[in-house]
Design a protein with these regions (language model features):
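Nucleotide/pyrophosphate-binding catalytic subdomain
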Residues: 1-124, 129, 287-288
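Hydrophobic anchor at the start of a short beta-strand
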Residues: 4-6, 82, 139, 203, ...
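Short, ordered loop/turn segments at secondary-structure junctions
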Residues: 10-13, 49-50, 86-91, 96-97, ...
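Electropositive, surface-exposed helix/loop patches at the edges of structured domains
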Residues: 38-53, 117-136, 140, 178-186, ...
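Residue-level signature of catalytic and energy-coupling elements of molecular machines
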Residues: 74, 132, 299
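A conserved active-site cap/scaffold subdomain adjacent to cofactor or substrate pockets
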Residues: 110-155, 159-178
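A conserved regulatory-domain signal marking ACT and ACT-like small-molecule sensing domains
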Residues: 150-305
Length: 305
């Protein structure tokens, strides 16, 4: 085809700031400088995943970093569309490794896609939506083996009145914390989250009441320390080998019946915890890993109707 192309070295413009996050201003300034040097060129090739940190050392964007690189570059040049090419026809409405006859989701909002990526959809890096959403750039997920397939389009628009997809996040630890009677409720909540903050352990899900807090975490590295600290003023129960199953879609309060379908589908499965997302786009449930396959299959049968 004889198309003129230029290789842009990613290490010259992809950089992390002092906080360990991509430095968007640096990326835009230095990338655009290279692009201006090749105004007549229409095809640019670069590397994904790698970058430099604030000290100038070679670093990386961690797992799935190539998708993140594409999104950061798209945001830097204010692209009309960001395309992520994989080996599957878009993001499916359930896990095709477990559930037969899954189908691609044709349209997702940025928030819906972020939730699915965070809670286990392997096709998409959880962070790659953020740069695109910030600059309102659509993201399209396409299949290299079937380039004519429509794939999945991710935009700021959300379809109303639909459940879109189900995803699952493995290796979850569930912690139930019951306050001692001597501790006022407001101090209890403050102390609990203070422990997780000091141990630098993110909380995936949380539900609270006056004397009970339940949390789900995916980083058990400092679990022993967390339990010891919480045990000073609370009764602590830990269950390992759990999974978060997340249902994503238009779950606004006025869409009566969606929650009933979700709970009805899981009526024979013990659910430890239910948490509603702050954006009304997802409901997350914690259960045993051994119940994961049965839960995904049941949800596939009952919620996509």
């Amino acid at each position: 085809m004889n198309i003129e192309s230029v290789v842009l070295p990613a290490l010259e413009f992809m950089r992390l700031g002092g906080n360990g996050e991509p430095d968007g201003r640096f990326i835009r300034r230095n990338l655009c400088k290279y692009l201006r040097q090749h105004r007549k060129c229409s095809l640019f090739i670069t590397q994904g995943y790698i970058c430099r940190n604030a000290a100038g050392e070679i670093d990386n964007l961690q797992r799935g970093g190539s998708d993140y690189t594409a999104s950061l570059i798209g945001a830097a040049v204010r692209a009309e569309e960001i395309q992520i090419w994989t080996d599957i026809d878009g993001l499916h409405n359930n896990d095709p490794r477990i559930v037969p006859n899954t189908v691609p989701v044709r349209l997702l909002s940025f928030d819906e896609a972020s939730r699915l990526a965070y809670f286990g959809a392997k096709i998409l890096h959880p962070l790659c939506i953020q740069p695109a959403e910030k600059h309102r750039i659509p993201v399209r997920l396409l299949n290299t083996m079937q380039p004519e397939a429509p794939g999945t389009l991710i935009t700021e628009c959300a379809e109303k009145g639909k459940i879109k997809a189900v995803a699952a996040k493995d290796n979850i630890t569930y912690i139930k914390i019951r306050a001692s009677r001597s501790l006022p409720a407001y101090k209890f909540i403050s102390k609990v989250f203070g422990v997780f903050a000091r141990c630098k352990t993110p909380v995936d899900l949380v539900t609270t009441s006056e004397v009970n807090i339940s949390v789900a975490i995916d980083d058990p590295e400092r679990l022993q320390e967390i339990v010891a600290e919480l045990g000073k003023y609370a009764e602590v129960t830990v269950e390992k080998d759990m999974v978060i199953v997340c249902v994503v879609g238009d779950l606004e309060w006025h869409n009566v019946g969606f929650e009933a379908r979700i709970i009805g589908a899981l009526r024979d499965i013990p659910v430890r915890m239910i948490s509603y997302g702050e954006s009304s786009s997802n409901v997350a449930l914690v259960m045993r890993s051994s119940d994961k396959s049965r839960a995904l299959q049941a949800l596939n049968e009952y919620v996509f109707v």
